[in-house]
């Protein structure tokens, strides 16, 4: 327990360092720009899982631009909904809305503008399915997670995680006009990855959530139960990630081989946290790696669609066939 007390200040500074060290303009801060790159990475991952990869430059730009604006709008609306809650937590009281650096009216107008431009980009430059899915992601984040589930249940992120899992569907729809098996697989992977990722962060910030009555799992059930839940979802993530071998049109063997060290590190950190659930250092390490893990998965999906990966796949298949004959 001494470790917990000693590392609380360090953890808050390290996990969300930029909020303390780099002050973003108020209008940009409410858009939560640090969340957008990972959402766009999973969008690209969804594209790479289809026969439509690679996309033309205009379609790619419209998809990523529309997705970024839809994500920004969701971030602003989330900040608007939670401005009173943010004002009651030390960690968030300095944010643009509770501190008065940005008016709610200005923020709301900005959110509507981002939503409209995102919809226009996606409808005109991509297709209606991609546009509809982006708006579904926005609504599910603001209404399903933020407004309905977050203040009411410890399983808020399990169900509400659907919002963060929609970008792969957008990517698949942008590439082919339909979702397909690969898009649904990456959607499912992000869904099972999300609880382990978010609960690691919630372990670090549980006293903030406790102070304002948000029923996050670490607050209600404690670190031991949370670490067990993280372990279950961590294993589910590892097992499901392997199905990317089948979901990829080409390069599946390359993906499977390169995936091994990612999964090994994830399980190592999950087990370390399970062995010492009170360690904020362990929770912080898992939280950070979980972000790199999902970025890495998406990068592997893209690399697996390269000519080099396809060639390596053919070489490995030929080698396996020779071994089976011998």
From Swiss-Prot:
Membrane-spanning segments: 35-55, 60-80, 106-126, 129-149, 157-177, 185-205, 238-258, 289-309
MF-aspect GO terms: protoheme IX farnesyltransferase activity
Pathway: Porphyrin-containing compound metabolism; heme O biosynthesis; heme O from protoheme: step 1/1
CDD domains reported in the protein's UniProt record: PT_UbiA_Cox10
GO CC terms in record: plasma membrane
Major localization class: membrane
Miscellaneous comment in the UniProt entry for this protein: Carbon 2 of the heme B porphyrin ring is defined according to the Fischer nomenclature.
NCBIfam families membership: cyoE_ctaB, PRK04375.1-2
Entry similarity comment: Belongs to the UbiA prenyltransferase family. Protoheme IX farnesyltransferase subfamily.
Name listed for the protein in its UniProt record: Protoheme IX farnesyltransferase
Organism: Synechococcus sp. (strain CC9902)
Gene name of the record: ctaB
């Amino acid at each position: 327990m001494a470790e917990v007390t000693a590392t609380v200040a360090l953890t808050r500074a390290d996990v969300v360092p930029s909020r303390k060290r780099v002050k973003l303009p108020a209008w940009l801060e409410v858009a939560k720009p640090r969340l957008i790159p990972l959402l766009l990475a999973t969008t690209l991952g969804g594209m790479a899982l289809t026969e439509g990869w690679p996309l033309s430059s205009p379609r790619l730009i419209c998809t990523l631009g529309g997705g970024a604006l839809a994500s920004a709008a969701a971030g602003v609306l989330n900040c608007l909904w939670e401005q009173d809650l943010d004002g009651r937590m030390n960690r968030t009281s300095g944010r643009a809305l509770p501190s008065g650096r940005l008016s709610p009216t200005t923020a709301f107008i900005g959110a509507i503008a981002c939503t409209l431009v995102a919809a226009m980009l996606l409808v005109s430059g991509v297709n209606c399915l991609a546009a509809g899915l982006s708006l579904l992601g926005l609504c599910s984040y603001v209404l399903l997670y933020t407004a309905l589930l977050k203040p009411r249940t410890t399983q808020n992120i399990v169900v509400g995680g659907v919002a963060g899992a929609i970008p792969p569907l957008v990517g698949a729809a942008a590439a082919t006009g339909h979702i397909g098996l690969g898009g649904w697989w990456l959607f499912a992977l992000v869904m099972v990855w999300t609880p382990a990722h978010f609960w690691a962060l919630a372990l670090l910030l549980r006293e903030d959530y406790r102070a304002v009555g948000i029923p996050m799992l670490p607050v209600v059930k404690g670190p031991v139960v949370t670490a067990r839940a993280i372990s279950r979802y961590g294993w589910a993530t590892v097992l499901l990630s392997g199905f990317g071998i089948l979901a990829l049109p080409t390069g599946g063997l390359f993906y499977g081989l390169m995936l091994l060290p990612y999964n090994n590190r994830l399980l190592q950190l999950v087990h370390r946290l399970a062995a010492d659930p009170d360690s904020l250092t362990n929770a912080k390490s898992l939280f950070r790696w979980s972000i790199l893990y999902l970025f890495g998965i998406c990068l592997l999906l893209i690399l697996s669609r390269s000519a080099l990966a396809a060639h390596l796949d053919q070489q490995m298949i030929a080698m396996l066939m020779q071994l089976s004959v011998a």
